[in-house]
Amino acid sequence: MDSLNSILSAISAVVWGPFILIPLLLGTGLWLTIRLGGLQFRALGRATRHVFATDSDDESPEGDISNYQALTTALAATVGVGNIVGVATALSIGGPGALVWIWITGLLGMASKYTEAYLGVRFRTTDSKGEMSGGPQQYLKRGIPGPLGSVLAVFFAIFAICASFGIGNLAQANAVATNMESTFGIAPAATGAILFVLVGSVLLGGIQAIGRITAAFVPLMIIVYVLGGLYVIFSHATEIPAAFAMIFSDAFTESAAGGGFVGSTIMMAIQYGVARGIFSNESGMGSAAIAAAAAKTPHPARQGLVSMTQTFIDTIIVVTITGLVIVVGGTWDMDRDEAGIMTAEAFSRVLPGDWGGTIVSLSIIFFAFSTIMAWAYYGERSLESLCGRKASIPYRMFFACLLFVGSVSELELAWTFSDLANGLIAIPNLIGLFLLSGLVARETKAYLAFDPKLNKPVDEVRAFVESQGMDWK
């Protein structure tokens, strides 16, 4: 295992180094921000309206789930272990300054998330069962002419399947098993068996079942965790200004060693901030476009705006809560091998009894469970794009069995594999976003000119779509 982890770490270091993924992620996000005229900043308020829109005023018959369910499914995939353990890992290696780079990745990533969700709906198709099928595997192949698009689509599908086993399975199952053992004394093998049964049962219901469950549980999970985090932060109210000063200072200077912290460079802050940022919000990975493609929406821009809010909620709200809890709680300089308990320790120092550790442990368990379900859908859709519907059942069976492996395996290997898979899945998608940015910018501009307040009735929007010759349904 150690030799395998070393090999994967070496490859991951190259992929996530200063010459490949970091400039590609930040550069594409900046480029899309410019092409879309800072859409993530000027339309965020209007986009929020569509998150809570009712079926009658914002949805069209085409699609499998509501736009709200598409958002919560995407949130289920992103608001997971990365928001708690991932952020702690970034701070333990990159220092408090890594949080700034997570924010930058998130803000620029909102433009990427809008673009990939837009394209997910724009190029979606209907499969043999009458369900919507979309995502990078569709818009890369159908949107980019020539063999390049097809090649990128195949690579994305392969890497997405790998990512579903990493970020969506091994890392999540390991986190659940670790917390079940530390909090409730349940053996990892028993947790693996429970996950196998629960996830397997949900997967039998497909995207509709996943959408219903995430719509019910994800908002509640986020609210409980955020409220607990805010209580911890304001219990250290006098230390908040110093915490922000440290965060911004360390983002652009080297962090000195102290406690269990061995020090970090600016490059480490950037590398781990960006890596954990994408692990948290998945902007640029293309995964959320698969859920967006299943949404009932009269125009791609509407779902793009809804999906864009997911990155804001995930990174600017939930990740910020975790980061501030760790910094003001004084646990960020613990030994990096203890990154998994940094957040719980910060909670426990403020909340009475075992409440702190229990809240964090339960949050990790429920966040991870919802992430597993969403990524099972992403991986299945990606495999179907290569092998057809016949591959669905074997994939679900293997995915469920792998949860047991993740529950009893080493955390370091699970995270290393997840980091590498995240990087590989993003590369073909980011290339596609760059090449298709002109199409998205042009059609978004036309739509916002037609519906600047984003409140046109569905029938008028559909008539506009037809007048533009957009054959996207």
Regions inferred by a protein language model and the residue ranges of each:
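N-terminal alpha-helical transmembrane segments of multi-pass membrane transport
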Residues: 1-81, 91-98, 109, 404, ...
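Transmembrane helix-loop junctions in multi-pass membrane proteins
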Residues: 3-4, 36-40, 83-87, 164-176, ...
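Membrane-interface loop-to-helix entry segments
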Residues: 24-28, 32-48, 156, 173-180, ...
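Helix-loop-helix module between adjacent transmembrane segments
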Residues: 28, 32-33, 105-130, 141-174, ...
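Flexible loop linkers connecting adjacent transmembrane helices
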Residues: 38-65, 89-99, 103, 111-148, ...
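Alpha-helical membrane segments and immediately flanking helix-loop junctions
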Residues: 57-93, 119-137, 141-143, 158-161, ...
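Selective recognition of specific alpha-helical transmembrane segments in multi-pass small-molecule
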Residues: 108-116, 193-207, 218-238, 271-276, ...
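Extracellular/periplasmic helix-exit of transmembrane alpha-helices
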Residues: 116-124, 228-246, 254, 258-260, ...
